[in-house]
């Protein structure tokens, strides 16, 4: 007969991280918010899809706001107070995600746009004709 296995608790440890970096990746289809410490270790993350939105609604500013609020709530539980914000991508949820982080109680010290721009690299996809 098999031995009963021991139940172990959650492997997540509560860390006290006073300041970190919020990475907001905003595409036309989704918005992903990752909050890391200064070394780059992810402390909290959320996305529009993880917040319960499906399909075309994931790309809306309200979905980005909801995702940012959820990530900020988890970061505040870890003791985070100040963040720098790095925004990447052309999506519609950029400004609302930043505003949601601020309203949630995180002090924003820096906002930087780190959208990658090609120096004429790969060929663009052909234009849509609708």
Swiss-Prot record:
Disulfides per UniProt:
none
UniProt GO BP: translation
Q: Which UniProt keywords apply?
A: Ribonucleoprotein, Ribosomal protein, RNA-binding, rRNA-binding
**What's an example GO cellular component term for this entry?**
ribosome
Domain of life, source organism: Bacteria
Question: Which GO-annotated molecular functions does the record name?
Answer: rRNA binding; structural constituent of ribosome
**Is this entry keyworded Transferase?**
no
This chain's function reads: Located on the platform of the 30S subunit, it bridges several disparate RNA helices of the 16S rRNA. Forms part of the Shine-Dalgarno cleft in the 70S ribosome.
- PANTHER family, from UniProt? 40S RIBOSOMAL PROTEIN S14/30S RIBOSOMAL PROTEIN S11
Q: Which family does it belong to?
A: Belongs to the universal ribosomal protein uS11 family.
How is the subunit organization of this protein annotated in UniProt?
Part of the 30S ribosomal subunit. Interacts with proteins S7 and S18. Binds to IF-3.
HAMAP family the record matches: Ribosomal_uS11 (MF_01310)
Listed name of the protein: Small ribosomal subunit protein uS11
Protein's organism: Prochlorococcus marinus (strain MIT 9303)
Lineage at the top is: Bacteria, Bacillati, Cyanobacteriota, Cyanophyceae, Synechococcales
């Amino acid at each position: 007969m098999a031995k009963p296995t021991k139940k172990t608790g959650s492997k997540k440890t509560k860390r006290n991280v006073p300041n970190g970096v919020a990475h907001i990746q905003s595409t036309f289809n989704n918005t992903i918010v990752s909050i890391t410490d200064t070394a780059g270790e992810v402390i909290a993350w959320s996305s529009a899809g993880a917040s319960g939105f499906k399909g075309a609604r994931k790309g809306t500013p309200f979905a980005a706001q909801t995702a940012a609020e959820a990530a900020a709530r988890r970061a505040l539980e870890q003791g985070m107070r100040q963040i720098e914000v790095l925004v990447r991508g052309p999506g519609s949820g950029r400004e609302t995600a930043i505003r949601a982080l601020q309203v949630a109680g995180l002090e924003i010290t820096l906002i930087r746009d780190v959208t990658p721009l090609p120096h004429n690299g790969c060929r663009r996809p052909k234009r849509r004709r609708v």
